[in-house]
A protein has these predicted regions:
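Von Willebrand factor type A / integrin I
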Residues: 6, 163-164, 178, 182-186, ...
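…and closely analogous acidic/polar surface helices at protein-protein or active-site interfaces
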Residues: 81-92, 102-133, 151
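Membrane-embedded catalytic interface detector for glycan/lipid assembly enzymes
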Residues: 370, 506-508, 516-523, 528-683, ...
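Beta-strand-rich binding/interaction modules
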Residues: 251-288, 295-299, 307-316, 561-586, ...
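Acidic, S/T/G-rich, low-cysteine, solvent-exposed domains in lumenal/extracellular/periplasmic regions
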Residues: 119-122, 187, 201-225, 232, ...
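Juxtamembrane linker/hinge segments adjacent to transmembrane helices in membrane proteins
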Residues: 1-71, 652-664, 695-702
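Short, charged loop segments at secondary-structure junctions
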Residues: 104-107, 142-174, 218, 228-231, ...
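DG-centered beta-turn motif at the end of beta-strands
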Residues: 5, 69, 93-101, 117, ...
Length: 702
C-alpha cells in the first residue's frame, strides 16, 4: 500500500491516547461505603464481566477510529511504484507534448480540441509538488529550438495559455525524440510523458527514421495518452495551386490549376472555389466531390497590374479553416531593362523593331552596345542580355556567371560570325557546340525549312487564336549552324536534319536561348515572317521571368532569399500578418543566399531592399494536416514497441477528470473515502456501545 501524504502517518501515535486513558482509569480508586456482607450479596459477577468486555470493545473502537482517520488523511492507495515505502517522496520530471497543429482547431460540444488539451494540461499541473519539474513541447515546433525543464508551475501555465493553433505540421515522433532528450538529462526517479493529441493518421512517425529509446524509456517511465479524436469531422482542403502560365503580361490571362480534396466521409455538392488576385475575387468554379475525392479545377484570370501579384484560391468555411486557402504569387514585368551586344549594329535591327512594336513599346527598356564592351557593364542591372555575334566577344565567363545567377540570355550568330568563334563561345559557356555551318550566307538557291515546332512551349502561349494549330509556317533558311542539343537542352524549333534552330538550355538558375541562324535577311527571311515579332517578344519575356516556388514551401520550413548578384546591406521581410523583419547583411555576402526561418504563417512573404520588392515567397499549409482519419490504440502501442518503450502506457478518457485519472494511474485507487466511511460507522457504533456500557456500569454500582 502507498500513501500520498505519508507525513500524516505520524498521527498514528494518537492511537495510544485511548489506551493511556484506559490504563489511567484502572489505577483510579473509587470509594464505596457499604458493608462487606451487603456488597457480597449485591455483587453480580456476570454484569461485571459484561461491563469489562464493553470497556475493551470501546477501547478497540476508539483506537480503530483514530487509526482509520489518520489513514484517511494519509491518502492510501492500493498499488503504486513505492520508493522507500512512499511514492510521493520521489521527485517527478514530466514532459507535456501538446498537439497544436491546426487539426486540433476542430470544435465539438466542449469547445475546440486544443483548448480542451490546454485545460487538461493545466489541471495536471496541480498534481505537481515542490521540486517536481516539467517541460512543454509543441508538436508544430518539435524541430525548432531547444526546450528546457522548469520547476515553476506559473511559467509553464503561462506557456500553455499562450498556445494557439499553428499552421505548421509536425510528427509526434519528433516531439517524443525531443522529450527523450530532456528526460535523459533528468536525475529524478519518476519520469512521465503526457501526450495530448488527436493522433491524426500519418502524423505519428516516419517509419524510416524511428529511433531506439530503451535506455531512457525504461520501466520507471509512464506515458499518458489523452486522445481528442472521436468526432466525425467535415473538412475540405485546397492541396495545390499551380500556375500553368509561364509568361506574364499585363491585361493577359493567367491559367491556374486548383486541387481540391474532400477529406470527409460524405459527398459534397457544389463546392465553390474562388480565385483572388491582389485580394480581388476575379473568378469562381464549382465542383461536386465524393467522399475522399480530389479534383483538379482550372481557373483563368486576367492580370490588370504589373509587379508582384498576390494570388490565392479559397473555398468556403468548414470545420478546419486553415486549409481553405492556398497561396502563390506571380511577377508581371513592366519596363524590363535589357541590353543588346552586337558585332555589327545593323545585326540587331529586326530584333529591336520586334521589341518596340506598338503593343509592347513600353515593355522593354533597351540598351545597345558593341560586343567588345560586355566586360565593362554590370549585367546584374538587366533582366535579359542578347548576344548577336561572337567575333569580338572576350567575356564569356561573365556571361556564364550572369546566367548561373538567374539572368536570361539569348545568343545568336551575327553577320560576321564564323564557325570557330561560335564554337568557342558556346564551348566556354558550357553549351553544345555546332558541328558545321549549313548552306550559304546570302544565297537563296538552297532553302532549308522547319521540321517541327514544340507549340507547348511557353513562348507560343496565346500566339495563335487557333488552339488546334500543330505547326507554324517555316521561313526560308539560307544558312544556319547545325547544332544538336546533346541532351543538355530542349529543342523548341527543329530543322529537317534534326538539328535545333531554336533551343532552350539551363545553367543552374538561368535560362539560355540559342538561335542558330542570324536574325538578318542574308541568313533567312525569318524577320519578315508574321511569327517573328511575337516569338521574339515572348522569348525575351520568358527569359526575363523568374522561376517561382509555386507555394511548395510549407509553413515552418526555411526558405532561401536569393540575393546573388546584388549589393545588399539590409533586407526587409514583410510577413503575411504585415509584421516586419529586418536582416542585416555584410557587403561581402552580396553573392549569397539568405536562409529565412520565421515562416510560421501561411501567405506571401515580401522581400524588399529599401522600398523595392525584389521577391515574393509563398508559404502554405501541409495537406497531410487536413486528414480527418485517426489512429487506434493499437497503432500507438505498436509505435511504442518499435521504439522499445519499456515503461507503462495509460490511455486516459478526456471525458473524465484527467487530474484524478492520472493520480489513479500513477499511484493506484485511493482508499481515503473508504477509511473515512468506516471510521464514521465505527464512531456511531462506539457511541451506542458507550451508552450501553454506561447503563451497565450504573446497574453494577447500585
Amino acid at each position: 500500500m502507498t500513501f500520498l501524504n505519508p507525513a500524516v502517518l505520524f498521527g498514528l501515535l494518537a492511537a495510544s491516547i485511548p489506551i493511556l486513558i484506559h490504563l489511567f482509569n484502572l489505577r483510579k480508586l473509587k470509594k464505596i461505603e457499604f458493608s462487606t456482607l451487603a456488597f457480597l450479596k449485591e455483587l453480580q459477577k456476570n454484569k461485571i464481566r459484561k461491563v469489562k468486555l464493553k470497556q475493551w470493545i470501546l477501547l478497540a473502537l476508539r483506537v480503530l477510529i483514530i487509526l482509520l482517520l489518520v489513514f484517511a488523511f494519509a491518502r492510501p492507495t492500493l498499488k503504486g511504484l513505492a520508493i522507500g515505502g512512499t511514492t510521493s517522496a520521489a521527485k517527478t520530471t514530466a514532459v507535456f507534448i501538446i498537439d497544436d497543429t491546426f487539426s486540433m482547431s476542430v470544435i465539438d460540444n466542449q469547445g475546440s480540441l486544443l483548448n480542451q488539451a490546454k485545460a487538461a494540461a493545466k489541471s495536471l499541473l496541480k498534481n505537481f509538488q515542490e521540486g517536481d519539474e516539467a517541460a512543454l513541447i509543441l508538436v508544430s515546433q518539435s524541430n525548432e529550438s531547444e526546450v528546457g525543464l522548469s520547476k515553476s508551475k506559473v511559467d509553464i501555465q503561462k506557456s500553455i495559455d499562450a498556445i494557439e493553433p499553428s499552421y505548421q505540421s509536425g510528427m509526434l515522433h519528433n516531439s517524443m525524440t525531443k522529450a527523450v532528450q530532456i528526460l535523459s538529462q533528468s536525475k529524478n526517479l519518476n519520469k512521465e510523458f503526457y501526450i495530448l493529441s488527436d493522433f491524426q493518421s500519418g502524423r505519428l512517425a516516419d517509419e524510416k527514421i524511428l529511433s531506439e529509446f530503451s535506455q531512457v524509456l525504461d520501466e520507471r517511465v509512464r506515458v499518458y495518452a489523452i486522445n481528442y479524436s472521436g468526432k466525425e469531422v467535415y473538412n475540405l482542403g485546397i492541396d495545390d495551386l499551380k500556375i500553368n502560365t509561364q509568361i506574364f503580361e499585363k491585361e493577359k490571362p493567367v491559367n491556374f490549376s486548383v486541387t481540391v480534396t474532400n477529406y470527409s466521409t460524405r459527398s459534397v455538392d457544389n463546392v465553390i472555389v474562388s480565385q483572388f488576385v491582389n485580394n480581388e475575387r476575379i473568378a469562381q468554379v464549382s465542383a461536386n466531390l465524393g467522399a475522399g475525392e480530389s479534383k483538379v479545377l482550372n481557373i483563368e484570370a486576367t492580370v490588370k497590374s504589373t509587379g508582384f501579384i498576390d494570388v490565392f484560391a479559397e473555398i468556403e468555411d468548414d470545420e478546419i479553416l486553415q486549409d481553405n486557402r492556398r497561396f502563390t504569387s506571380i511577377f508581371v514585368p513592366d519596363n524590363i531593362p535589357i541590353i543588346i551586344f552586337t558585332d555589327e549594329p545593323a545585326d540587331s535591327r529586326f530584333v529591336e523593331l520586334a521589341l518596340t512594336a506598338l503593343e509592347n513599346r513600353n515593355t522593354f527598356v533597351i540598351t545597345k552596345k558593341n560586343l567588345n564592351e560586355v566586360s565593362a557593364y554590370d549585367l546584374k542591372r538587366y533582366e535579359a542580355v542578347l548576344i548577336i555575334g561572337s567575333q569580338n566577344l572576350n567575356a564569356s565567363a561573365k556571361l556564364k556567371e550572369y546566367s548561373i545567377n538567374g539572368g536570361g540570355l539569348l545568343i545568336a550568330p551575327g553577320s560576321k560570325t564564323d564557325l570557330a568563334s561560335y564554337q568557342k563561345l558556346l564551348s566556354e559557356m558550357g553549351l553544345p557546340s555546332p558541328s558545321s555551318l549549313v548552306g550559304k550566307i546570302g544565297g537563296q538557291t538552297n532553302l532549308f525549312l522547319f521540321e517541327s515546332t514544340d507549340l507547348n512551349h511557353p513562348v507560343f502561349q496565346d500566339i495563335f487564336t487557333n488552339k488546334e494549330k500543330t505547326k507554324i509556317e517555316s521561313p526560308d533558311i539560307f544558312s544556319y549552324f547545325r547544332l544538336n542539343t546533346q541532351g543538355k537542352g530542349q529543342s523548341i524549333i527543329t530543322m529537317q536534319d534534326g538539328s535545333s534552330f531554336l533551343g532552350e538550355y539551363r545553367l543552374k538558375n538561368g535560362r539560355i536561348f540559342l538561335l542558330n541562324s542570324a536574325p538578318i535577311l542574308t541568313w533567312n527571311n525569318f524577320p519578315i515572317k508574321g511569327i517573328f515579332v511575337p516569338l521574339i517578344n515572348k522569348s525575351i519575356l520568358y527569359l526575363a521571368s523568374k522561376d517561382k516556388n509555386e507555394g511548395n514551401i510549407l509553413a515552418g520550413n526555411d526558405f532561401d532569399i536569393d540575393i546573388r548578384g546584388r549589393s545588399v546591406s539590409q533586407l526587409k521581410v514583410i510577413r503575411p500578418d504585415n509584421t516586419e523583419d529586418f536582416i542585416s547583411l555584410d557587403q561581402k555576402d552580396g553573392n549569397a543566399v539568405v536562409k529565412y526561418k520565421k515562416s510560421h504563417l501561411t501567405g506571401n512573404y515580401k522581400i524588399l531592399t529599401g522600398s523595392k520588392v525584389i521577391d515574393e515567397i509563398s508559404v502554405n499549409a501541409d495537406p497531410l494536416e487536413s486528414k480527418v482519419q485517426y489512429l487506434e490504440k493499437q497503432d500507438i502501442e505498436n509505435y511504442l514497441n518499435k521504439i522499445n518503450f519499456k515503461g507503462k502506457l495509460f490511455f486516459l478518457n478526456r471525458e473524465e477528470n484527467i487530474s484524478d485519472a492520472v493520480v489513479k494511474a500513477r499511484f493506484g485507487s485511493e482508499l481515503w473515502k473508504h477509511f473515512l466511511f468506516i471510521a464514521l460507522v465505527l464512531a456511531f457504533v462506539e457511541m451506542l456501545v458507550a451508552r450501553n456500557a454506561k447503563k451497565g456500569l450504573v446497574e453494577v454500582s447500585k
